[in-house]
């Protein structure tokens, strides 16, 4: 059960803030994923205020590293991200933000930012036979 007793709309819940491991600029990576298909759409960055806004408004807010300002996805493009859930990874240095994406997530107009860059060459790994079917 989630404790929702903290209700201060001007700062991030200190219990959440204490769990974050920010980079030297005070940012945490946020992986944005379509909530129903699990498609990875993009990666953005959040500071405490961007995370607070994301958790309390139902819309995703990022901190723009290039423009040094907050931006809410979809305000200019109409390609809104409606928050469905937010999880913190085990190390506290990354967020998974599940969204209902309207239109393209990428500034290039593609649904996912990972379509434009494309796959990189890789040596594909294969699971040993003894690890097949969930063994080991």
Swiss-Prot record:
Keyword hit for Acetylation: no
Residue ranges that the Swiss-Prot or TrEMBL entry lists as coiled coil: none
GO molecular function, one term: phosphoribosyl-AMP cyclohydrolase activity
GO biological processes: L-histidine biosynthetic process
Pfam families to which the protein is assigned, alphabetical: PRA-CH
A GO cellular-component term linked to this record: cytoplasm
Cofactor(s) recorded in Swiss-Prot or TrEMBL: Mg(2+); Zn(2+)
Residues that hold Zn(2+) according to the record: 90, 106, 113
Enzyme Commission code(s) on record: 3.5.4.19
Residues holding Mg(2+): 89, 91, 93
InterPro entries for this protein: PRA-CH, PRib_AMP_CycHydrolase_dom, PRib_AMP_CycHydrolase_sf
Free-text comment on the cofactor: Binds 1 Mg(2+) ion per subunit. Binds 1 zinc ion per subunit.
Enzymatic class: hydrolase
Presence of keyword Zinc: yes
Cross-referenced SUPFAM superfamilies: HisI-like (SSF141734)
Pathway(s) the chain acts in: Amino-acid biosynthesis; L-histidine biosynthesis; L-histidine from 5-phospho-alpha-D-ribose 1-diphosphate: step 3/9
Subcellular location: Cytoplasm
HAMAP family listed in its UniProt record: HisI
Function: Catalyzes the hydrolysis of the adenine ring of phosphoribosyl-AMP.
Family the UniProt entry places it in: Belongs to the PRA-CH family.
PANTHER family: HISTIDINE BIOSYNTHESIS BIFUNCTIONAL PROTEIN, PHOSPHORIBOSYL-AMP CYCLOHYDROLASE
Subunit structure: Homodimer.
Stated name of the protein: Phosphoribosyl-AMP cyclohydrolase
Species of provenance: Bifidobacterium longum subsp. infantis (strain ATCC 15697 / DSM 20088 / JCM 1222 / NCTC 11817 / S12)
